Amino acid sequence: MLRQAGIPHEVHAYTPAAPRGARSGDSRGYGLDAAAALGLDPSEVCKTLVVVADGALMLAVIPSSRTLDLKRLAAAVGAHRAAMAEPRDAERATGYLVGGISPIATTRPLRVILDVPAAALDRIYVSAGRRGLQVSLRPGDLIAAVGATVEAISVR
């Protein structure tokens, strides 16, 4: 999708570890694992989380060094309530396995919310669709490619 759209990007492969949190469904482990393996600051490597807000599935893209604030996300999208999607639902909606969920080229179109700290960086890394593969690009290019909105949805 990025190549077809003429969006400059680089793909980075690494050997994924099995982070402690990954086995329990804690998505913090995958992003931190990618950052360590690629020698990057965790604030540059984003995790893509599938969230349900008032029944609608959407993607929250936040730095791996931060935690999603579901109340902030709900307020940002005008929802009464937001919760993490069940892993099975996340995989079905995106076409990717948990730990490799990308905001790019999902199975079905999903709303994408990019966190303010990630949008402020020169370059971010997001999953390229599988564990062990990241793609780096400018936040503005990601916003343009997926129609993302930028909101303050995380805490330290």
What are these regions (language model features)?
Residues 1-156:
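Extended, low-hydrophobicity, polar/charged segments
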